[in-house]
Amino acid sequence: MATVRPFDKMPMLNAAALLLVGTEESHREQLASAMLKEPKTFEVKIHMAQSLPLPYEREHLRPRFDMVVFLINLHSQLSLSTILASLTQLDVNFFLGKVCFVATGGGQVKHCMVDIATVKKLADTHLSTLLFSEFASEDDVTCTAQRLLQMLKICAGLVPGISALYLGSFMSSTLQTDQF
């Protein structure tokens, strides 16, 4: 099994690669489909995995991942435990702005098996962005896909003058203004 590293391969020209990790296959497919449908000025390659580490056999075929998105289903404790185990298989350099957590199912709080505060603490601990999304709504999936594409473009270095290191400060300032 191979640890995922951000800088061990050459970047692709005018392209970005994303790794979606989560136990819910339907959520991964919905999000990937929505991202591929969106108009964009660069090529997007999306790889999906239920958990990390990735199998070593196909390592030579994999692109350099510009961003890793962890999907956490708040209705499943297994989802959280799988993500926690997967985080240890990720190179620490990814946590320099190239990791995002997407929590799903938070709209029905009484059915949540995973506390929202736990997921917030997880994202804060890893200095990563946290997005909330309801995959029952097509509009919400589209909005999440658009936001992830904007972040991916920055992580891939396709936005001049902006580094993935700035994503945390950009996202925290937008979260503060959204609260009012």
Curated annotation (Swiss-Prot):
Top-level lineage group: Eukaryota
Keywords, alphabetical: Centromere, Chromosome, Nucleus
InterPro entries per the UniProt record, alphabetical: Centromere_Cenp-M, P-loop_NTPase
GO cellular component, as recorded: chromosome, centromeric region; nucleus
Compartment(s): Nucleus; Chromosome, Centromere
Its job: Probable component of a centromeric complex involved in assembly of kinetochore proteins, mitotic progression and chromosome segregation.
Name of the protein this chain belongs to: Centromere protein M
Source lineage: Eukaryota, Metazoa, Chordata, Craniata, Vertebrata
Gene: cenpm
